[in-house]
Amino acid sequence: MKAVQLSSFAGLNSLKLVEIDRPTPSKNEVLIQVKAAGINFAELQMISGRYPAPRPLPFTMGFEASGIVAALGSEATNLKVGDRITSIVSSGGYAEYATADTNMAIPIPQGVTFAEANAITIQGLSAYTLLMFAARPQPDESVLVQSAAG
């Protein structure tokens, strides 16, 4: 399968389109046929070598992906082949297929595109977590989101 891998921490020219083996889901994972993948601030930092916890090179980029469940691990019982999901992924979302833990998979509602669902996976959950657990707005308070840029 095709995948985009990072070959060094030297910028965008370090991204390479390569052929790799399709990942196999472990017992609690699903295999996703990727339809959309996000580009996050952390990935941009990683490409430039500024990410605080770099992975060993080369590796497939992409912390999140949306797509169709193509296969199930032996103990993955809460999803079925053909389900539309978005998830933080185990094996890199910039590929034709990626694996994800079933506990991280979020079903995509009817009428929501893969790209739209993907937009809430990391950025949306980060914003929600900061708002609800750090800011903790009260019922009589208002919240202004002035910028949503990385």
Enumerate the predicted regions with their spans.
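Short, conserved catalytic or interaction motifs in soluble domains
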Residues: 8, 74, 110
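NAD(P)H dinucleotide-binding glycine-rich loop of Rossmann-like/cofactor-binding domains
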Residues: 36, 86-148
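Conserved hydrophobic/aromatic beta-strand scaffold that supports enzyme active sites
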Residues: 17-22, 66-68, 97-99, 105
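Glycine-rich beta-strand-centered segment in the early N-terminal region that forms part
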Residues: 21-38, 50-92
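Short beta-strand-to-turn element immediately C-terminal to the catalytic PLP-Schiff-base lysine
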Residues: 6, 47, 70-73, 99-102
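Exposed loop/turn and edge beta-strand positions of beta-sandwich/beta-sheet ligand-binding modules
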Residues: 11, 16, 28, 63, ...
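Cytochrome P450 core scaffold surrounding the K-helix E-X-X-R motif
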Residues: 42-48
